[in-house]
């Protein structure tokens, strides 16, 4: 724990320094592309009464200014969006109301990672509804498709001559959920399948930067597992420029593998868990520059009243 605290302290100082050094660069280089990533977003259980009483805007009120400054904002959506109950037999089953989806877009969210262990909570029909409601609201779903091949296709963001491909996958089993190669589903590949997809894309589009948003690791563990470290090394070697992790519900360290940045876990963001470590989260803003360099800044948040605060 002491080592982890030191890492976080250094990360905070690094975040401040990066924020200072990249702001002038971004102003001078209008073609830089910035993508902001958040931790886990839940819109049910303890968050639901707050959303109903005060609205979605309240949940993101303090972080919305950061959303507005980025070219894209990617959340990890840990809940299906559907008005029809069709629960899967799981320990924890969530559902968000479709009427809230437009408000997510209004606060500045542009992309939602669907490849996690909770968007499946209301079955295939819930997944399909989630995809539909996100699209109708103008939010791009990630990690979803009608076949494994489609699920493994990235979403590409473009600004000027900058292009960034975002892959989204979950690399762990899901309780009472069977992944089929054909039919609507989330991206749940093997490590080999994901690595090969990154390798193939990198070889086919060498000028496009690659970000992999992963649901992985062990819940409530402050250090990445051996499996996380091994997969991160494989993905970095295969061409991933950055890896963004979710699922542990706590912050995990930042690492650099060659030229690749690895953010093992961003922790929670909009969530209702109570242990102190689950009340901390982090936003990561990746900046892709025209000289092919990548910089980042981190913004730490404290979760109070189930919403991120500064």
Protein language model regions, located:
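Positively charged n-region of N-terminal signal peptides that target proteins for export
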Residues: 1-5
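Bacterial N-terminal signal peptides
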Residues: 7-16
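Acidic, metal/ion-coordinating pockets
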Residues: 20-310
């Amino acid at each position: 724990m002491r080592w982890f605290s030191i890492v976080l302290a250094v990360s905070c100082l690094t975040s401040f320094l990066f924020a200072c050094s990249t702001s002038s660069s971004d102003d001078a280089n209008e073609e830089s592309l910035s993508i902001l990533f958040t931790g886990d977003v839940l819109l049910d259980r303890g968050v639901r009464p707050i959303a109903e009483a005060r609205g979605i805007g309240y949940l993101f009120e303090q972080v919305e200014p950061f959303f507005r400054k980025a070219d894209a904002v990617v959340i990890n959506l840990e809940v299906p969006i559907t008005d029809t109950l069709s629960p899967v037999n799981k320990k924890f089953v969530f559902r968000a109301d479709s009427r809230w989806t437009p408000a997510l877009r209004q606060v500045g969210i542009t992309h939602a990672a669907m490849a996690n262990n909770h968007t499946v909570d209301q079955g295939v029909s819930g997944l399909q509804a989630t995809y539909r409601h996100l699209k109708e609201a103008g939010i791009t779903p990630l990690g979803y498709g009608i076949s494994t091949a489609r699920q493994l296709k990235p979403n590409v963001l473009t600004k000027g001559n900058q292009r960034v491909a975002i892959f989204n996958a979950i690399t762990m089993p899901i309780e009472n959920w069977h992944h089929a190669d054909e039919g609507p589903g989330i991206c749940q590949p093997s490590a080999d399948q994901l690595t090969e997809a990154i390798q193939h894309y990198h070889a086919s589009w060498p000028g496009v930067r690659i970000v992999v948003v992963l649901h992985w690791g062990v819940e409530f563990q402050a250090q990445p597992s051996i499996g996380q470290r091994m997969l991160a090394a494989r993905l970095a070697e295969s061409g991933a420029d950055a890896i963004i992790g979710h699922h542990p519900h706590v912050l995990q360290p930042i690492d650099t593998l060659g030229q690749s940045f690895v953010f093992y876990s961003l922790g929670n963001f909009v969530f209702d868990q109570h242990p102190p470590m689950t009340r901390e989260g982090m936003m990561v803003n990746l900046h892709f520059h025209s000289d092919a360099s990548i910089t980042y800044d981190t913004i730490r948040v404290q979760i109070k009243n189930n919403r991120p605060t500064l």
